[in-house]
C-alpha cells in the first residue's frame, strides 16, 4: 500500500509539473519582445565564415506551408534557413531566404545538445563503391597533408512541436547548442 501511495504522489508531481509547463507558454510568449534591430541590407555578417568550408548552406532548412506569427511579425509560407546569432548578449534566430535576412526572432531558451543526440538522430550517409574509394583517398591525403584535411560541417537538426493554445515551439539544433523559439499558428 505504501508503494502505491508513493507511486501516486510521484506521478501527481510529474503531471502537475507538465501542466505548469503547458500554461507557461502564454507567459513566455508575452514576456518576449520583438527585436528592434536589423542588419544592414539584410546581410548576415557571419554567413561567410559559417559557409566558407561548405558547398551548401550549413543551416537547418525550414519549410512552412502555412504562416506563423510572433506578435507583429508574420512569417509567410516558404523556405527559410534558420541561423542562430547573438546580439548584445541575447540569442536570436535569423530567418533567411536567398541569403538575406527576412525575420529576426528571439530565443527563449538555449541548451547544450546531449552527447549522443546527432549519432542517434541523424541518418548515416550511404555511399556507392566509387564514393567509398574517393572518401578513403581523401582521408589518406588528409592524414598525410594536414592542411588538406576536410573540416567537419556543422551538425544541424530541427524539431517542431505543436503545443497547447495554438503555440508552436521550434527547436533548432546547431552544433553544440539547441535553441527554442515560440510562435503561434494563429494571430493572438
Regions from the language model: what does each represent?
Residues 22-75, 83-188:
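Extended, well-structured beta-strand/loop surface patches
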Amino acid at each position: 500500500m505504501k508503494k502505491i501511495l508513493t507511486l501516486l504522489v510521484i506521478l501527481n508531481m510529474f503531471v502537475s509539473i507538465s501542466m505548469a509547463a503547458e500554461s507557461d507558454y502564454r507567459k513566455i510568449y508575452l514576456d518576449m519582445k520583438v527585436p528592434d534591430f536589423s542588419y544592414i541590407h539584410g546581410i548576415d555578417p557571419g554567413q561567410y565564415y559559417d559557409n566558407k568550408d561548405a558547398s551548401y548552406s550549413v543551416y537547418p532548412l525550414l519549410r512552412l506551408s502555412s504562416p506563423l506569427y510572433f506578435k507583429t511579425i508574420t512569417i509567410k509560407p516558404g523556405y527559410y534557413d534558420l541561423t542562430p546569432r547573438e546580439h548584445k548578449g541575447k540569442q536570436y534566430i535569423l530567418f533567411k531566404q536567398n541569403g538575406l535576412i527576412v525575420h529576426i526572432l528571439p530565443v527563449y531558451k538555449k541548451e547544450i545538445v546531449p552527447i549522443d543526440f546527432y549519432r542517434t538522430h541523424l541518418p548515416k550517409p550511404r555511399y556507392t563503391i566509387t564514393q567509398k574509394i574517393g572518401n578513403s583517398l581523401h582521408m589518406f591525403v588528409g592524414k598525410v597533408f594536414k592542411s588538406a584535411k576536410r573540416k567537419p560541417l556543422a551538425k544541424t537538426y530541427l524539431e517542431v512541436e505543436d503545443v497547447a493554445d495554438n503555440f508552436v515551439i521550434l527547436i533548432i539544433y546547431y552544433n553544440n547548442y539547441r535553441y527554442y523559439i515560440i510562435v503561434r499558428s494563429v494571430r493572438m
